[in-house]
Amino acid sequence: MTKINPYKGILVELKDIVFTSSSDQIKLPINTFKSILCCGATAQYQCGKINRAQYYSRLARDFALSLADVTALFDTVQATIRPEESFLAFLAELKSRFGEQLKLYAVANMSREDYAMLKSLPIDWSLFDGVFLSADLGMRKPELRFFRHVLESISMKPEDTILVDNDTDNILCALSMGLKGILFGSTSVPQALTNLLEYDHISRAEQFLRSHAKSLHSVTHTGVTIRENFAQLLILEATGDIDLVELEYHPTTWNYFIGTQSSQLLLHKHNADRMTTMTSCWLVSAFLVVS
């Protein structure tokens, strides 16, 4: 039986994901820069209602800045824009792996002038099956009509589509329509996309277990590895594969820990409360399994 990828399209924000930039060298206070990016003039500029000259003049007036300061601000940031090569390579790998089964679209709240600058950068734009700019559409994310227009244009259903974006509002709007959302920065986007697109989850899980055989130990949220028999016995019960686990056998009563190093962590004041909590959670899990 042929297995079909459950998702047919990915919408990817260009700014800060496909392309990155830095505001470290700007002369204005960072809070002023953030306010500029969120102001009404920026929204009008990104929707194509005003051109760059009008936009800069509005910002100078609204924020009591000189036109030279506004121009220098954006010139400084623009000079730092770079393609995110590793992410582009990942997108190319996806396109190669899934072929025509998966479409990739760029979406951005961006002016035509800014997009023209990005187009001059050396990336393979053929990766994208289409580009949707707020300036061309006269609407921006997170407006519902923006997503409706894109989905209608590409003839896809929300449930078949993934949005990768760096703005929580955009993700929440997409989720409300039925799209799958991945918030950039909160997780590894390549890993999250792989998890969604790789349909054979059982095979992936089995591969993970085999590649980490004998090392499937409990780890605290601070990165402390706890070698103990309880988790090993749970894995053995679930999989029936003795080659996956590391057990310390005892002739009669079993020790909870494997070796002495893990048990000595209990003596460390910093870990005592955490270990007590972890032990309680494991015991509750064991009770539920047995029940």
UniProtKB/Swiss-Prot annotation:
Catalytic activity of the protein: (2E,6E)-farnesyl diphosphate = (S,S)-drim-8-en-11-yl diphosphate
Transmembrane segments: none
Record pathway: Secondary metabolite biosynthesis; terpenoid biosynthesis
Enzyme class name: lyase
One annotated GO biological process: terpenoid biosynthetic process
Superkingdom of this protein's organism: Eukaryota
Xref: Gene3D superfamilies: HAD superfamily/HAD-like (3.40.50.1000), Putative phosphatase, domain 2 (1.10.150.240)
Induction profile: Expression is regulated by the secondary metabolite regulator cclA.
Function: Sesquiterpene cyclase; part of the gene cluster that mediates the biosynthesis of astellolides, drimane-type sesquiterpene esters that show antimicrobial, anti-inflammatory, and anti-tumor activities. The first step in astellolide biosynthesis is performed by the sesquiterpene cyclase astC that catalyzes the formation of drimanyl pyrophosphate from farnesyl pyrophosphate. Drimanyl pyrophosphate is then dephosphorylated by the sesquiterpene phosphatase astI to produce drimanyl monophosphate which is further dephosphorylated to drim-8-ene-11-ol by atsK.
Similarity annotation: Belongs to the HAD-like hydrolase superfamily.
Protein name (Swiss-Prot/TrEMBL): Sesquiterpene cyclase astC
